[in-house]
Amino acid sequence: MADPHSLASPSDPVGPDGTIVVVGASLAGLRAAEELRHERHGGPVIVVGDEPHAPYDRPPLSKQLLAGTWDEERVHHHAPDKLDTLGIEFRLGLRADSLDVSGRQVHLADGSSLDFDGLIIATGARARRLPGTDGVDGVFVLRTLDDCLALRSRLDQFGDAAGGDAARVVVIGAGFIGAEVAATCHGRGARVTVVEALETPLANVLGVEMGAACAGLHADNGVELRTGAGVAGIDAGADDPVTVTLTDGTVLPADVVVVGIGVTPATDWLEGSGLTVSDGVVCNESLFAAPRIVAAGDVARWWHRGLDQELRIEHWTNATESGPRAARNLLAGSAAATAYEPVPFFWSDQYGVKIQMVGRPDPSDDVVVVDGSVEERRLIALYRRGDRLSAALAFSRPRQLMGYRPLVEAGASFDDALALARS
């Protein structure tokens, strides 16, 4: 199928001295800005970020930093003195308020504006919150560095189960972030309950069989998992800091509640800009949203030519790959731009098990475990769609998984994948 989001008019290359503004100072924005300098762009590069912190890595927030095994400095991508050598101007703690596409201006929350010759939108996503929970003491989300530090500080007020003063933690949502938070809180000695609306966690991503395998990790480690129940309300308790009431009538007392029900693309500042926004900034196959404007990372919804579908991917690898590609395409112009066709890859660390996937399975795909077993929590599972290999999943088999990555990238037959498994 042809790209349904092709530009109405071409995007000329940005000149060597043109000003490029990057809105978003997380991983995709940082990698885009670095790539501009790597490509020897000589004009001003200005990165605007709404958080006050220098660019940092998000995966450790739900693991090492929350656990307390890392300090804050370890999550930053560069030491402060290294940032000064990049030749990039960072304007941090400053939100973009609006975009004037025709005038090529970004309007900022302090009343100032930035003129640009090229714009890279990398504003990422924001954690979804449950209605009515703003301001309820003890209720947290985990998306930003400040979110993590606030949650860790709360957990630091408690001991562990052995001492009898363990925190009672309720995690709402058994997706990858929720599961990682549950595992980390359990590792800190908390008594953890996970609440998931689906009957099988992650069934919409991994299918029922492998979703059930992920659910089993909670049971293996003594973490209570309640599935098939939504949240009816979260309130400040009379005798407990927080009470969580489920749709089945169950009431869960808690000291800490972590809401992990996904994210929404940070596109509110683009309202009225004229860009097409629909669960992200809608882009063509080479990440152009409009002439001289590209998007990257969690906020970009683009046409994946190889998979013949729109994608918006929230994983770390996509941020590291899409940021540089968007930067190169912006410099080259739309006529010389290269389609962005990554093979999706993600990982998650839970209870000492490393879960990795390459490809993009459909829940209806057939799944065959070709190495290890679900019971031992060490396995390779292959996903079949028709006669093709659509994805491969590993539990604590990182080296073996990499052998299947070229097959997934090539759209190999399932028989070829089985042949590799037997070799």
Task: Give short role names for the model-derived ranges.
Residues 1-21, 76-168, 245-247, 256-260, ...:
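FAD-binding core/adjacent interface of flavoenzyme oxidoreductases
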Residues 17-19, 242, 248-276, 351-423:
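C-terminal catalytic lobe of FAD-dependent flavoproteins
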Residues 3-89, 182-205:
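Beta1-alpha1 glycine-rich phosphate/pyrophosphate-binding loop at the start
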Residues 150-206, 210:
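Rossmann-like NAD(P)H-binding beta-loop-alpha module
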Residues 2, 137-162, 240-245, 250-325:
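FAD-site-proximal beta/loop scaffold in flavoenzymes
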Residues 42-44, 84, 90-107, 114, ...:
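A Rossmann-like FAD-binding core segment of flavoenzymes
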Residues 26-30, 52, 125-127, 146, ...:
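Residue-level detector of alpha-helix initiation sites
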Residues 4, 8-10, 15-19, 25, ...:
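Mid-to-C-terminal Rossmann-like scaffold of FAD/NAD(P)H-dependent oxidoreductases
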